[in-house]
């Protein structure tokens, strides 16, 4: 058997209003509604954001691979893009994608105190995943944000 460890998967259909809402759908909704977003810390905190199509691709490749015979126990593969994106860059990318779709969002982020326990930086090492299941992320962070913003603009019912 194979284990897959997912890093910050995002994309269409994520609930921006749930109690465990991920940052990307939450910020997209707030920005579409022309409301401020909050960033804890200085915005340099970073994550390895992975567009959903990359995660689906990894699942399919893992299901079809025969390349795990070299492992004594079932291997665990990281599923991500293999790069760090700061929260400040995330804000700029969403803002840019909204602008490309005719929405001008001009509200600056509200910076709050860094939250105790938050991890400052997270980046996956995907070399094992690339080597054994031949995973190569097809969607960059930027293209994933663009597709996600476009989906929310077309499909998400926004509440006042």
Regions found by a protein language model. Give the residues of each.
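C-terminal substrate-binding subdomain of Rossmann-fold SDR/epimerase-dehydratase oxidoreductases
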Residues: 29-160
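Conserved beta-loop-beta element that borders a ligand/cofactor-binding pocket
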Residues: 1-12
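Residues that scaffold the ATP/ADP-binding catalytic core of kinase and kinase-like folds
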Residues: 12-13, 132
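Alpha-helical scaffold segments in soluble metabolic enzymes
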Residues: 26
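Conserved catalytic loops of nucleotide-sugar-dependent glycosyltransferases that act on lipid-linked
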Residues: 23
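Active-site loop immediately N-terminal to the catalytic Tyr-X3-Lys motif
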Residues: 16-17
């Amino acid at each position: 058997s194979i284990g897959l460890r997912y890093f910050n998967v995002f994309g269409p259909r994520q609930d921006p209003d749930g109690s465990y809402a991920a940052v990307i759908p939450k910020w997209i909704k707030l920005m579409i509604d022309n409301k401020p977003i909050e960033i804890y810390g200085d915005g340099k905190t970073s994550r390895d954001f992975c567009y959903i199509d990359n995660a689906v691709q990894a699942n399919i490749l893992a299901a079809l691979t025969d390349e795990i015979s070299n492992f004594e126990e079932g291997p665990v593969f990281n599923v991500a893009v293999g790069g760090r994106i700061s929260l400040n860059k995330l804000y700029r990318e969403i803002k840019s994608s909204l602008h490309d779709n005719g929405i001008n969002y001009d509200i600056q982020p509200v910076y709050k105190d860094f939250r105790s326990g938050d991890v400052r930086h997270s980046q996956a090492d995907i070399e094992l995943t690339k080597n054994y299941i031949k995973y190569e992320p097809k969607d960059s962070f930027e293209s994933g944000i663009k597709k996600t913003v476009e989906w929310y603009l077309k499909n998400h019912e926004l509440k006042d």
